[in-house]
Amino acid sequence: MAQNNVYLILFLCLMFLSYSQGQVAEEDFPLAEKDLPSAKINCPEGANAYGSYCYYLIEDRLTWGEADLFCQNMNAGHLVSILSQAESNFVASLVKESGTTASNVWTGLHDPKSNRRWHWSSGSLFLFKSWATGAPSTANRGYCVSLTSNTAYKKWKDENCEAQYSFVCKFRA
């Protein structure tokens, strides 16, 4: 058994050496990375792709709970979870480019037990934070989170969950 492993290692070393010296052509490796088909993300009309998800801005104004339920009924999604600065920039751009006049747009971030422990409605881990100055508020506590137009939709503010805002749904492509 050990002898077979030695032969395998020797073979792999020789192949690597030959390849690195240009003696083995790329055509000898039919499944080279450049030949693999790229994954095309198909989102429904009106939705935009980012990563492996589709994002859909809904301009109708609903409460946070109604908005999340709407997203769940739409392709088994949730209100948008924003997990990185890059995703935050994408969502902000999506909202701005829509031409919406909404001053606030719901995200999926909420505090379901009103104890200042924030959770994404999708179940994603809450690691990335982008709170607006003074948020979350200690004086005017809200338990649902929106993006605000006065921060170009890049910063978060805690709001009353019964307020009615436009929202962004996020679902797997």
Swiss-Prot record:
Transmembrane segments: none annotated. Disulfide bonds join 43-54, 71-169, 144-161. Might act as an inhibitor of spontaneous calcium carbonate precipitation. Residues 41-171 form the C-type lectin domain. This is Lithostathine-2. It is found in: Secreted. GO terms for biological process: myelination; suckling behavior. Residues 1-22 form the signal peptide. One of its GO terms (molecular function) is carbohydrate binding. Expressed only in regenerating islets and normal exocrine pancreas, but not in normal pancreatic islets. Expressed strongly in pancreas, weakly in liver, but not at all in gall bladder. Keywords: Disulfide bond, Lectin, Secreted, Signal. The keyword Signal applies. InterPro entries: C-type_lectin-like, C-type_lectin-like/link_sf, C-type_lectin/snaclec_domain, C-type_lectin_CS, CTDL_fold. One of its GO terms (cellular component) is extracellular region.
